[in-house]
């Protein structure tokens, strides 16, 4: 670590100690959260545990009535999961790539991210895992698709496999049960790469459209809104015509996407902006309206204006308030609908992988949670499913939750852990 990087980390650490004494004690979570007044940070808080990984015999802690085991291990930064119709499990292995720092704080952030194993050389592949004997542990692994550009979201429609690379959606010929993709891909839509680089995918119920989450380049449009065109949005791609459009906008970093079956509405989890305090604003879970605008970068949680940003009063007036707050800077990424009966003791609701904070005085996230639903809406407080990803002193991270899906048996969850390099399986005890 060079002197300037160390100096920046020391300053960031000092901000942690200074701000911890005035940090809110109550997390901004739920349908009606108590969001503290914004406190603009001249130097952003920088606090993140060093990546350690899991030692043999050590694993996350599970809620009462549940158990957890490693479905697959030895991966290279697993981020997203897709379960195929035959029970095979696809895992996107990708990582934020190192870039030249723009200023002193950026230099410190890059150093912190590398120490946390959140930045480096990306494997750029999709691997296939097969549990042939049904014991909850995969015995077979294949390189399903290689040579991609930070692959993330995946989907299969008929005889086509789709992957969301950071620079666009690519389609490949696919045969059910195949161990690997061998045909040439064709680009369907281009996205601006980098920044918030993940590109999640989900298919409509009728199989005619794909939706893609595309995050912003910057925190609050720092490099100008022209650079943000086509970003901070959810895109809709018509598979028959090839036409693509922005379905919803003003979503700073929409990652996980899921369908809620009662109303048929699309839901997403969104990572909100930095630099306004530990709980301000909270990340959130929300339904997504066609043509809806959700505030970024001008405002948050409805019409709460961010005065760091040149304003657009017409857009602020249109801003839709999210449905459910998930706490400040929890980095809620993974999302799947879990029907009642999947896990004992849990009803209908959304499961959310919280990757964990890096920019607040006290850590938040670093767990897998459940938000109960009734009549198509969140209906109560969140519950923890998995935790124990941090050392007791919070200096080390054993793992970090990311993508989550229903397991092939319909009675389990599979969750990607991109620090432990494991796919965890959660089932009834």
PLM features per residue range, with description:
Residues 84-87, 156-158, 203-207, 260-263, ...:
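Residue-level detector of Asp-centered blade-edge/turn motifs that repeat once per structural unit
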Residues 70-75, 142-148, 188-193, 246-251, ...:
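Surface loop/turn motifs at the tips and blade-to-blade linkers of beta-strand repeat domains
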Residues 405-429:
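Blade-level signature of beta-propeller repeat domains, shared across WD40, Kelch, NHL, RCC1
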Residues 4-63, 98-102, 106-116, 121-123, ...:
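Beta-propeller domain segments
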Residues 137-159, 165-205, 216-219:
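Asp-box/WD-like beta-propeller blade repeats and closely related beta-sheet repeat scaffolds
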Residues 78-79, 101-157:
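Blade-loop segments of beta-propeller domains
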């Amino acid at each position: 670590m060079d002197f300037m990087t160390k100096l920046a980390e020391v300053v960031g650490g000092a901000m942690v100690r200074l701000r911890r004494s005035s940090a809110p004690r109550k997390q901004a979570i739920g349908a009606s959260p108590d969001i503290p007044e914004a406190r603009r940070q001249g130097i952003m808080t920088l606090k993140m545990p060093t990546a350690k990984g899991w030692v043999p015999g050590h694993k996350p802690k599970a809620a009462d009535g549940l158990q957890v085991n490693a479905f697959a291990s030895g991966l290279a930064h697993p981020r997203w999961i897709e379960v195929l119709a035959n029970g095979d499990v696809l895992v996107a292995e990708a990582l934020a790539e190192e870039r030249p720092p723009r200023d002193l704080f950026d230099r410190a952030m890059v150093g912190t991210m590398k120490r946390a194993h959140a930045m480096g050389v990306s494997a750029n592949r999709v691997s296939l895992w097969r549990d042939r004997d049904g014991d909850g542990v995969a015995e077979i692994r294949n390189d399903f698709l290689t040579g991609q550009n930070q692959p993330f979201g995946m989907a299969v429609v008929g005889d086509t496999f789709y992957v969301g690379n950071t620079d666009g959606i690519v389609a490949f010929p696919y045969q059910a049960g195949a161990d690997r993709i061998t045909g040439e891909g064709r680009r369907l839509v281009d996205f601006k790469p980098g920044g918030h680089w993940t590109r999640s995918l989900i298919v409509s119920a009728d199989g005619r459209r794909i939706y893609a989450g595309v995050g912003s380049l910057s925190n609050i449009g720092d490099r100008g809104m022209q650079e943000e065109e086509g970003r901070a949005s959810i895109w809709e791609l018509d598979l028959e015509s090839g036409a693509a459009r922005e379905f919803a906008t003003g979503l700073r970093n929409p990652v996980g996407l899921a369908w809620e079956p009662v109303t048929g509405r699309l839901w997403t989890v969104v990572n909100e902006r930095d630099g306004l305090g530990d709980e301000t604003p909270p990340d959130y879970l929300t339904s997504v309206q066609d043509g809806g605008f959700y505030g970024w970068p001008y405002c948050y949680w409805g019409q709460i204006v961010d005065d760091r940003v040149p304003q657009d009063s017409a857009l602020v007036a249109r801003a839709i308030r999210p449905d459910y707050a998930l706490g400040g800077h929890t980095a809620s990424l993974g999302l799947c609908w879990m029907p009642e009966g999947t896990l004992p003791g849990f009803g209908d609701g959304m499961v959310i992988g919280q990757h964990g904070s890096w920019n607040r005085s006290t850590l938040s996230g670093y767990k897998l949670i459940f938000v109960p639903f009734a009549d198509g809406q969140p209906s109560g407080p969140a519950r923890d499913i998995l935790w124990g990803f941090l050392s007791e002193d919070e200096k080390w991270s054993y793992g970090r939750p990311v993508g989550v899906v229903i397991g092939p048996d319909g009675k389990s969850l599979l969750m990607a852990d991109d620090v432990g390099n494991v796919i965890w399986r959660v089932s009834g005890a």
